[in-house]
Regions:
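Generic structural signal for short, flexible, solvent-exposed coil/loop and linker residues
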Residues: 17, 47-50, 101, 111-113
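Primarily recognizes the serine-hydrolase "nucleophile elbow" in alpha/beta-hydrolase
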Residues: 1-22
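Short flexible/disordered coil segments
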Residues: 7, 39, 43-49, 118-128
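Active-site-adjacent alpha-helix of alpha/beta-hydrolase-fold enzymes
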Residues: 24, 29-89
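Alpha/beta-hydrolase-fold serine-hydrolase catalytic core, especially in secreted/extracellular enzymes
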Residues: 3, 63-128
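Arginine residue identity/basic-tract feature
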Residues: 4-6, 17, 40-42, 51-52, ...
Length: 128
């Protein structure tokens, strides 16, 4: 990995390879997984990837799906978008701002460490 990279976010990644992880701050922000053999493997890969990071944080966007990680649900009418698009988008944007604020700018973030009542769509799986 390029040494200029100081922190990364994987927004609802497809497949991650644990051996590609680095000892830098990593946030894996994901939609809920359906239970299947593939997703059980995917959870193992994501967990190992996060374990190798320093720190490795995993969060789930409750009620969302892959489309909710961008702004398309806000500007286009998608039939397959679940949940409150604005609330989900606000949660994603805030988490990204807080994560990079903490790990690139040194601004402490309670949201990243503990979550927040005003962001009920965010579930912290592993903490820093």
């Amino acid at each position: 990995m390029d040494k200029r990279v100081k922190a990364i976010v994987l927004n609802d990644p497809g497949i991650v390879r644990p051996e590609d992880s680095e000892a830098i701050p990593v946030l894996i922000l994901k939609s809920p997984h359906k239970d299947s053999e593939f997703t059980r493997d995917r959870v193992k890969w994501e967990t190992e990837f996060a374990r190798r990071a320093k720190p490795g944080i995993q969060m789930t966007l409750v009620g969302g799906n892959h489309v909710n990680f961008g702004d398309l649900p806000l500007i286009m009418d998608f039939a397959n978008v679940s949940g409150d698009s604005k609330a989900l988008n606000d949660t994603v944007r805030t988490v990204l701002r807080e994560f990079f604020g903490e790990y690139l700018l040194g601004k402490h973030s309670e949201l990243i460490e503990k979550g927040a009542a005003n962001y009920p769509l965010l579930k912290i799986e592993t903490q820093p």
